[in-house]
Curated annotation (Swiss-Prot):
InterPro entries: P-loop_NTPase (IPR027417), RSG1 (IPR039677), Small_GTPase (IPR001806). GTP binds at G64, R65, S66, G67, A68, G69, K70, T71, T177, K178, L179, D180. The gene is cplane2. It comes from Xenopus tropicalis. Residues 52-255 are annotated as: Small GTPase-like. This is Ciliogenesis and planar polarity effector 2.
């Protein structure tokens, strides 16, 4: 996974902290026997008294056309098995992902609680209440396209217009999925640069494939998976933390 160059300057979060000895200790709270821990809506990581941290909770609505890779994207970040076949999500599905980060000007880490909301395109069209429910109290909307489907990329501006009104003050992030299928890509780096220059939105790139498994083969290697997901999780943390700081008047917004 990789984060494309974004228009917002200056990191507020240390993007390399997760690889430090202290960062690895905190990562231990979301791992169990080399595998990822999975958390329900009311569960949270258990930290020892020697590992103080604050919790910052955010709701993220993941949207995109059918087959764009929404469910696979969330599964990748959560350490779940990436589905080998496409199945339309029925109704609304929520997934909690915890990620520890340390602000650049603080010695006290923050554990981000990302609550991802996903729903199938069919459900959105059939039930009028689904879209308002997904957007209610959302901090960010993630607009997904597939690198293997150029039309899904070209549809992103229209997708944004269909999903959000100009008055809706939420973070907007574009995610390109299926980066692992580079031999079939229909979207180039020049396309991404032109898009960012025009729309002034951050673009992230995601591999929609399972990472290595643990030695016995039963389950995915949680620590390796976290390293793969770190650029995107750090990127989302940076965007949401900066947004909060701008709203609070603690830092300036984008130029």
């Amino acid at each position: 996974m990789a984060l494309a160059e974004a228009p917002r300057p200056g990191p507020l979060m240390d993007p390399e902290w997760h690889g430090s000895p202290e960062g690895k200790e905190y990562l231990g709270c979301i791992l169990r026997k080399k595998k990822r821990k999975f958390f329900g809506l009311i569960e949270r990581p258990v930290l020892s008294p020697q590992l103080p941290a604050d919790i910052a909770s955010y709701k993220l609505f993941v949207c995109g056309r059918s087959g764009a890779g929404k469910t696979s994207f969330i599964a990748k970040l959560a350490g779940l098995e990436v589905p080998s076949m496409h199945h339309e999500t029925t109704g609304i599905q929520t997934t909690c992902v915890y990620w520890p980060v340390r602000p650049t000007h603080s010695a006290r880490p923050v554990i981000f609680r990302f609550q991802f909301w996903d729903c199938g395109e069919g459900a959105l069209r059939k039930f009028d209440h689904i879209l308002p429910a997904c957007k209610e109290m959302a901090d960010a909307v993630l607009f997904l396209f597939s690198f293997t489907d150029r039309s899904s990329f070209e549809d992103v501006p229209a997708l944004i217009s269909r999903t959000l009104g100009q008055e809706e003050d939420v973070a907007r992030v574009v995610i390109g999925t299926k980066l692992d299928q580079y031999t079939h890509t229909d979207v180039t780096e020049n396309d991404l640069r032109d898009f960012q220059r025009t729309w002034q939105l951050p673009v992230m790139r995601v591999r929609s494939v399972n990472g290595p498994r643990v030695a016995e083969g039963r389950g995915l290697d949680g620590r390796v998976g976290l390293v793969e997901c770190a650029p995107v999780l750090n990127g989302l943390a940076e965007i949401l933390w900066r947004r909060d700081q701008v709203i609070a008047g603690l830092v300036g917004g984008a130029d």
